[in-house]
Amino acid sequence: MLAAISGSYVIPAMYSLSPNPHSTPFQDKVFEDTYDTVLMAIGRRALTEETAVSNAGVKVIPENAKIDSDNEQTNIPNVFAVGDVLHEKPELTPVAVQAGKLLAARLYGNGTTQMDYQNVATTVFTPLEYGCVGLSEEKAEELYGADNLEIYHAYYKPTEFFIPQRNPQRCYLKVVCERAAPQKVLGMHFIGPNAGEVIQGYAAAVKCGLTFETLESTVGIHPTLAEEFTRVTITKRSGEDPTPQSCCS
């Protein structure tokens, strides 16, 4: 659950420093500050203890009570799990639905397709949305090394920002690529109106092996938000200012 609350607040933020998911959350340390917006991400936990999966012999990860599985099959061959209960899998409803459909097809319909948990797109539905697919810049650096990456980025001004002359630095996009040609796209990130709609379309392209060479050769639809990805040329490595210099970014 996510909520943004306007106003000025003094919030005593209390966080558990214990890895035990069943410990009391309000303990150990208190941080206090004043905020103009409070973002509450309540989250959820796996109910494997309440459902007593251990009685069937199913093993769980002690730190989070989740089940470690490659193809939704637990350590007990005839017990399967899908959704948020799986360890290190995206906690998203569409992921659970897709995995469940494919599992049912394999069990009862002679299907062979496994769930692909890589490059799953998602969006945070805040007033200016944030959408992404693929790797973050930090994760890409961890896997590939900073010297082997090229990070394209830009601020942009949506059409609806022109009349009120809103600050273009509220909207931002980033493309994480391999440095070597043809620069395979490893991640795409977008902050702005309708980010979910924009990223949903590019998610299919990323799963198909999108490269930056293909992206920059694509003609955008003007004026749209999604076209900003086809216009980005500035890299972080260059040190150039990514702020738009004209009405068309």
Per-range role (PLM):
Residues 1, 5-7, 135-139:
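N-terminal glycine-rich dinucleotide-binding loop that anchors FAD/FMN and/or NAD(P) in oxidoreductases
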Residues 3, 7-32, 38:
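Conserved beta-strand-loop-beta-strand element in the redox core of flavoprotein oxidoreductases
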Residues 9, 59, 147-150:
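Conserved beta-strand segments of alpha/beta enzyme cores
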Residues 18-19, 76, 167-170:
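A short, glycine/Asx- and small/polar-enriched loop/turn
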Residues 33-109, 201:
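FAD-site-proximal beta/loop scaffold in flavoenzymes
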Residues 94-117, 146-148, 206-212:
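Internal hydrophobic alpha-helix adjacent to the cofactor/substrate pocket in enzyme cavities
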Residues 113-129:
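Flexible, acidic loop-helix segments that line cofactor/substrate-binding pockets
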Residues 125-136, 141-249:
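Flexible, glycine-rich terminal cap/loop adjacent to redox cofactors
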